[in-house]
Structures are given as C-alpha cells and as structure tokens.
C-alpha cells in the first residue's frame, strides 16, 4: 500500500486548503489537476473516484476516497498527532470542528450562489441575477463578520500555529470581495488571515494558487 495521498484539484480552488494542510505537515502527496471548467484536465480520472466531479477529492493511502474540504481536513487532523491540525484540548478542538462546518454551510454555499445566480431564480434577466448576487454577497460578508466575532485567535485560530480552521478560512475568504470587506469591518481578523497567508509553511502553496 502506498503512503502517498492523491489530491484532485485546480489552481485557485478550494483544493488549495487541502494541499496546504498536506504540505504544512510534510505528508507525501501528488496533485492532479482536474476540474469541470478545465476540459483538458484529468476529468475521467476524477469521475472514476467521485461521480460528482467535485474538488477537492482526496484518495487516501489506503485507497479510500474523501470529498468535502471540511471532512478531509477533519480526517487529516484526526490522523495526525493531537495538536497538529486540530487542537489537543477537547473544548478547543470542538470549537475548531464547529468552525470547519460553519464555513462550508454559511460561506462556501453563498459563494456558489454568487458564481451561479441563474440556478437560484426563475428570473433570468441581468437585473434579477445581479440582485441575487448582491443580496447573497451582503449575507456572505455578514456571515464572515459573525465568524470573526465567534472564533478568537490565540495567536491563530488553532493555537500557536495555523491549524485546519485557519487554512480553510484563509482560502475561502479570498473570494467574493470578502477580504476587502473584512479589512474595513473586522481588521483584526483580516490581519490574522494575512498572517496565515504569509506563514512560511503555507506561503508556497498559496503563491502557486494565487500568484501572490
């Protein structure tokens, strides 16, 4: 059995969070470019392990398949020694698990509406679609404000070093104007995200995905 993780993802996508976690912990892995918007990518290979063709999709060393960013990060955190991606303290760990569910449920889901507003209304004219996007973006930014108020840094959300929740927040907050909004309305949390971005163990991955 190989000890290598196989990650299906694409540049600038949510797979960056999983890639960052694997890289930060020096876990052997290989990234395969695959996405429905990249027709020349390894879509058939992705479809074979995940019929939904969603990324990230992670094939574990034992051959089992994991999907959903939060589920993958939780499993990696449980697999590694306590205190690495998830805190060792049970109460702190419970809050990090809460945050890992909060982001997909309240933030990631809103981004999908902003990206594809035509899926969420019968009114297909441009004005109606823009109204859906604007309303959803406002709600998304409010959800991030609530997140910032609920999850204190110590100095990072996960403790002394960036953990799973720090990584996921740093990735998902890059979309839909969230960083600019947080810089104005939650500057301390915005500063935390920048610290995660520039952390030496994560910076190479984020640079690969966002050229910054």
Regions inferred by a protein language model and the residue ranges of each:
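Residues at helix-coil transition
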Residues: 77-81, 152, 197-198
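Positions that flank functional sites
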Residues: 36-37, 162, 211
């Amino acid at each position: 059995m190989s000890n290598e993780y196989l990650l299906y993802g694409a540049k600038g996508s949510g797979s960056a969070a999983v890639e960052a976690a694997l890289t930060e912990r020096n876990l052997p892995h290989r990234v395969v470019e695959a996405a429905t918007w990249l027709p020349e990518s390894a879509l058939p290979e992705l479809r074979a392990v995940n019929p939904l063709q969603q990324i990230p999709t992670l094939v574990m060393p034992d051959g089992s398949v994991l999907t959903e960013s939060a589920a993958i990060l939780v499993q990696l955190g449980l697999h590694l020694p306590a205190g690495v991606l998830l805190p060792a303290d049970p109460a702190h760990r419970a809050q990090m698990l809460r945050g890992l569910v909060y982001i997909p449920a309240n933030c990631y889901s809103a981004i999908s509406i902003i990206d594809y507003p035509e899926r969420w209304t019968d009114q297909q004219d441009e004005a109606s679609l823009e109204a859906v996007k604007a309303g959803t973006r406002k709600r998304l930014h409010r959800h991030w404000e609530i997140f910032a108020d609920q999850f204190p840094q110590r100095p990072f959300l996960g403790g002394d070093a960036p953990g799973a929740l720090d990584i996921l927040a740093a990735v998902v907050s890059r979309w839909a104007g969230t960083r600019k909004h947080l810089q104005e309305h939650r500057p301390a949390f915005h500063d935390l995200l920048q610290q995660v971005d520039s952390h030496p163990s994560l910076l190479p991955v984020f640079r690969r995905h966002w050229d910054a």
